[in-house]
Amino acid sequence: MDMIRPFGTLRMTDVEIVGGKNASIGEMIQGLAQADVRVPGGFATTADAFRLFLRENQIEEKINAKLQALDVNDVNALVAAGKEIRGWVEEARLPAALEDAIRQAYGEMGDDPDVAVRSSATAEDLPEASFAGQQETFLNVRGIEEVLNHVKLVFASLYNDRAISYRVHHNFEHSEVALSAGVQRMVRTDLGVSGVAFTLDTESGFRDAVFVTSSYGLGEMVVQGAVNPDEFFVYKPALEQGKKAVLRRTRGSKQKKMIYAEAGGVKTVDVDEAEQRAFSLSDDDLTELARQCVTIEKHYGRPMDIEWGKDGRDVQIYILQARPETVQSRAGRTLERFELTGKGDVLVEGRAVGSRIGAGVVRVVKSLDQMDSVQDGDILVADMTDPDWEPVMKRASAIVTNRGGRTCHAAIIARELGIPAVVGTGNATRELHNGDEVTVSCAEGDTGYVYAGRLDFHVNRVELDAMPEVGMKIMMNVASPDRAFSFAALPNEGVGLARVEFIISNVIGIHPRALLDYPDVPADVKAQIEEKTAGYASPRDFFREKLAEGVASIAAAFAPKPVIVRLSDFKSNEYHHLIGGPAYEPTEENPMIGFRGASRYRSADFAEAFALECQAMKQVRDDMGLTNVQLMIPFVRTVAEGQRILEILAANGLTQRENDLKVIMMCEVPSNALLADQFLDLFDGFSIGSNDLTQLTLALDRDSGLVADMFDEQNEAVLALMGMAIKAAKAKGKYVGICGQGPSDHPALAQWLMDQGIDSVSLNPDSVLSTWLHLAGEQA
């Protein structure tokens, strides 16, 4: 009977011997070392050794009897039983044969090396069961006596309250689950950084990205949810092509880190402010980490959940453990979309986990002994949650925490339970009070919101494999990059309108000319710029990188389908609201027909700002390889202006038809339809902007409520101009679509456009399914 097995002798076929976690470590050491996946070595105790331990100490039957009589839904009884059983295990002695084997194996690792002692259950990490965090991990364990003691503590952790409850609710017999202790050489992440990576997007299931969370020090802070980490997405196709692959970065607060304590074990300390303001991983680090993660995913043939660390001494990236991802991998082909229809005040916001909505009564829980106060359907609010809280998490309709990121245990369990969670709010326990009725929404992108009151929402469900054919392409209007992955799951033929205004106003938030003039700007503007651009090489780099990240996120989500990116079309009053904006913007009587679109691009005052936009688009297409991005020019008044814009694009490295670059023109000024042949000689196609075309055809100010009742995209004059544009494009064999609000609001207009032979309609995501089915019904 083997008492221990070196990691290097293990494969995934040994799960029954050393549990899922340790078998996976062995699999990577044996199977992936040649692929330069770096995994620290060590050894594992066996399931046989654990069972021998229980038998020799005559506690096996006693434990089983206690558990058989336990009602795990009685939280107080669960806590008492777990504590008693763990006491029996901790007081027991390790069998002599096991102790001798551990002494020898640890001795062979060197002179009292610091190790992590990890738990690995024999039922853990099977594809259908996530036991994430159910047992303990102990870090910076040094010396044989400490190792022996911590092996016993790991054995006891099989009977943690959360582990007992989890087994019952997932129909595992307690007696059939054994524990293996993994003793693994520590990576000095206390001097570096660490975190968690998933080889898909955890919220949408998007498979072409690696999602990484990262913070300073030992990884337990990220796993426990004790810190708000940095977040990154890395694009797999770009990685494989050797292109710039980092899709998106979000800087976390990273206020604390866990490091070695002087006498062994660990302690938590504050992170320097300069480190908090910087990103914890460079692009080179992210590329190397993602490469190892993708290699692991390919080896296992399924999405993976991976803990990693960067050693602060040798600055290498190491893989600490890997397990199958168990939530999105089980998702079927039925699309479920939650949509908030009611309105309320936002009380707190944080990182969204999942894409659902939940409503209920707030229950603030400050410690484990308050767990039994949580009733079915409550909103569980806490500073942070620990896997120990799992027995009551399943009662909640939503979870809200002050701390934590989207890869902490609380987030993983919330996803598995199918309930929304908003983590890392910073102030939930202060702003939310027991008895408050609230609605928790994770259906609005990366940011999750807690609203006052019980708000109305509805759920749309559709079988994706059952969508009927329609006679034209249904595309989508997308503004928010952080919703692109989930929007891409809807039936679609690409993006007919990607709006960069959302990225500039909501993500960048600073007038581009203020960034260009930095540091020669007013003191208050300078301070705001420095705060927002922390972590980037310069304010200019911040603008270019953030705009590129936003566009790339949308383009990657829908690739290889076309993504038509409309370059900025802010009006002067809209630019005025950005940080630093008032110094650069004129006061116009009617900005709707003023300094906007193409006229801005050719203005000497705006030329350098437009060049930044062009640099971002060039980065997305050339450096990241996302050549599905097509450019669209808004509000072109004259043919000469259109020609000038193409020259400006070329001067900025965006030459039409080079590297398959298509440049589309918005058809939204009546002159565009009236002189369609001339405009189409210049551009690769039209996208009809029904909002502005209606405004300018009927001489109606879209911003004026006094004439709003006359605004009608289906007015015969507007339809006549649309018809002219479609006919001209068809005659020249050029693309013609529509991206205005009209078809989203009026399915009959979409039907009329289809009858005219338009190539595509681009709809708001919330109207894609209804319009698609309406058009299919009209055809039937």
Curated annotation (Swiss-Prot):
The active site is at H409. Mg(2+) binds at E668, D692. Keywords: ATP-binding, Kinase, Magnesium, Metal-binding, Nucleotide-binding, Transferase. InterPro entries: ATP_grasp_subdomain_1 (IPR013815), PEP-util_enz_mobile_dom (IPR008279), PEP_synth (IPR006319), PEP_util_AS (IPR018274), PEP_util_C (IPR000121), PEP_util_CS (IPR023151), Phosphohistidine_dom_sf (IPR036637), PPDK_AMP/ATP-bd (IPR002192). Pathway: Carbohydrate biosynthesis; gluconeogenesis. Catalyzes the phosphorylation of pyruvate to phosphoenolpyruvate. This is Phosphoenolpyruvate synthase. The lineage of its organism: Bacteria, Thermotogati, Deinococcota, Deinococci, Deinococcales.
